[in-house]
């Protein structure tokens, strides 16, 4: 019986790669055309599904061709080709099935299991979509691992005994990640990760396409933007020019018979693009790579001088301006000992071999890229799992109700770095009902977050009194938009002072409401006998506090809370009921501090 092989797959935006471990070392498998990378392109023609090189060859002539589908993974968007709407998972599954088939031909037996890589900044929906695509393709996806982490595995496999810190800069066709890892005694620990889910080589191509469109408008008085075939040819020519400019100072773009115009000669385009022009038109894209590097270093709490190596991953790192930016920021030459197109798949194969027990003494410790939490009273985002926390992890915290006789709570799960829930990404929500009717602050609702090794999150809420529970696995969040990914941490830093002030205002108001509710309840219950004169003073303070709550005068409210607490404590002393009163005061403080649902 043939030995079971777990293949490693880098399912890329532009190209995909499949690898296995043979005799303890990762090996990239060539496709049926003898190439080590396979274009992530699917074409439909005469009822046949064509994948890879042959599909890419049809981009310019066959409108039923799909490329860069990875950018739609985890969204509700579809692509209309072959007279049908296809979900991104379906197209990705066709690519995976193609990789699976040629792997089986190379290995000589059936392949059923795989480790697939994703960008570190992929959210839950995108990770789930990747697993679903694998399932459609007939693969059991044993593990989803982050691309920079996989690259580090491949780079460091023969260096596991040497302690070192490495930065992996991963710029692919459609996504960008920076991860910092520590390698020591066979452990690959991710210290931090940052990135942009919507930045990649496609964006550099698109800048050349825009330049060509403008050139054609100016020189030929023709707009080709509505001509699908012409645009496909421009895109292909732009990609080729970008690649040429990585090794040459200029690229010649030739597009014969680009547009056939009725009653006139066909338009043929010939243009020369200099590297200096290309770098000028794409400088804003290069600059977008800066912040994630700085964020990853800050989150890892290390200095640039602490880095032992810098690894460039992804075909887009061949762009000279990108290399120059990385090396200028880090003041270190990048290590070019790995193939940027292949190293991620090789790392995935290594992880597969670890899972299969073929490779020992290697432990991978990854992290979650953004903070996860829930919305609590006043719209506060209460974090449960901070960004760059090791996974897998389970974390629980107890919350309570905000209203008297509240029989249901809504759990809203948010992702991001801002203190207010509305300014973060809403990943999902669910209701927990059947809570026993009780005064606010009495029910105990335990909320548990579980992030598995694939980075997929499950949230469970349980009423500790009735044991009723409800849970959700985050599958329906859409992909973080370009602006959200790029701005999320930057906004948090820029607005930290204002956010903190707003969050403090909300917390102060909630504290005041809880205090008033607690004191009124204690006095009305008659558990403590307070002299009428003192009771009148407290009632006046409570009235003033309520007015300040309505007016949202937070600074005055803080002072009045202190005065109310002082007056109440004096009244208790006057009542000379120390034991009972001490207990009451402790309970009051506890209630004031407890976080609640609205």
Curated annotation (Swiss-Prot):
PROSITE patterns: HSP70_1 (PS00297), HSP70_2 (PS00329), HSP70_3 (PS01036). The modification Phosphothreonine is found at residue 175. Pfam families: HSP70. Induction: By stress conditions e.g. heat shock. Residues 571-598 are annotated as: Disordered. Acts as a chaperone. This is Chaperone protein DnaK. It comes from Mycoplasmopsis agalactiae (strain NCTC 10123 / CIP 59.7 / PG2) (Mycoplasma agalactiae). The gene is dnaK.
